[in-house]
C-alpha cells in the first residue's frame, strides 16, 4: 500500500483555493438518489478536492490483468451494457457485465457503466435483402451484411435507424426505444444497492454512433427520456448521471448531469494532462459545479502533468485490450509509475468510502 493521505504542496493548494472555480456539488441531480449514490458523489468530490485522481479500467479481465502485472488494482471498473440490448440478445449475444460489476463492487470497487446500444429494429439486412431494398430505394434496419455484421449495430454506418424520427411518441421506433430502456432497467435493477456512474449515449457529437447521427437535439431528448424513465418509472436511484461530450450544443442541462466527461484517445506517446478538454468541460455547465472526468482514455494522462496544469480529473478509465496491456499506448514502466503515484488512488486506498 502506498501513502494515501495526500497533502497538497502549498503552491498547488493555493492555486486551487484561488482559482475562482466553484467546488463541485455533492447533491445528486436525482432528488431521490440512494444513500450509496450520495456517498459516492461526495467521495469523488472529496478526492478531487484533495488533488487525487481515481484510477479506472474497462472490463474485469483487464482490471485483473492490471492487478497481476502492474501491482495495483484500479478503483473503478467499467462495464458495458451492449450485449443486453434486445436486438443483440435476439441474435444470441450473452453478457456477464452485471455479474462482473457485482464482483468488483464486492471487492470495494466503484462501477461505471456505458452502453453501446444496439440498433433497435427487428429488421436485419442480409447482403441479398439490402441489395434488393437499395434497388427500391428504401433500406431499413440493421445492415447484417458482410461489410457490416450484426455485432457492429451500434455504429451509424451499420444501420439506417433515424433517431430524429424515432423520438416521435407515435412512432413504432419510439416504442422500441422504450422497450430497450425497460430491458436495460431490468439489468441495472440487479445493482440497486450498488452506486453506479452511468454514462449513456457517449461520444454522441462524433456522429459515429446512431444516437448522435441526427444531431444534438434528438440525442439530448433521448438522454432526458433515459433519465426520466430510469429514475421515475423504474426507481433506479443508485445511478449517478455522467454526460460524455464537451460540446455545449449537445449538453442536456445541469438538472440531468452529475458528472461531465469526455473520451480522449491521444496519439501514441501523448500522456499530457488534456488540459484543453478539461477547460472545455469546466465551461460546459456555466457554473463550474460539476465533477469532471475522463470517461475513456487510450493513453493515461501523467498525474504530475495533471497537477502542474491544474487539470484535476476526478477519474480516468483506460480502455480494454491493447490500450492497457500493450506497450504502444501505455508502456509498462509508465503504467507502474502512474499506479504507484501518490496522486492516483488505487483500490486498496479507498476501502470504506461507502460506510
UniProtKB/Swiss-Prot annotation:
Gene Ontology process terms (BP): substituted mannan metabolic process
SUPFAM superfamilies: (Trans)glycosidases (SSF51445)
InterPro entries in alphabetical order: GH26_dom, Glyco_hydro_26, Glycoside_hydrolase_SF, MANB/E
Alphabetical keyword list: Carbohydrate metabolism, Glycoprotein, Glycosidase, Hydrolase, Secreted, Signal
Matching PANTHER family: GH26 DOMAIN-CONTAINING PROTEIN-RELATED, MANNAN ENDO-1,4-BETA-MANNOSIDASE E-RELATED
Upper taxonomic lineage: Eukaryota, Fungi, Dikarya, Ascomycota, Pezizomycotina
The protein's role, per its UniProt record: Endo-1,4-mannanase, a crucial enzyme for depolymerization of seed galactomannans and wood galactoglucomannans.
Catalytic activity: Random hydrolysis of (1->4)-beta-D-mannosidic linkages in mannans, galactomannans and glucomannans
Domain GH26: 35-348
Enzyme Commission code: 3.2.1.78
UniProt GO MF annotations: mannan endo-1,4-beta-mannosidase activity
Catalytic-site annotation from UniProt: 203, 296
Name listed for the protein in its UniProt record: Probable mannan endo-1,4-beta-mannosidase E
Protein family (similarity comment): Belongs to the glycosyl hydrolase 26 family.
Annotated glycan sites: 50, 144, 162, 287
Binding-site positions, substrate: 208, 265
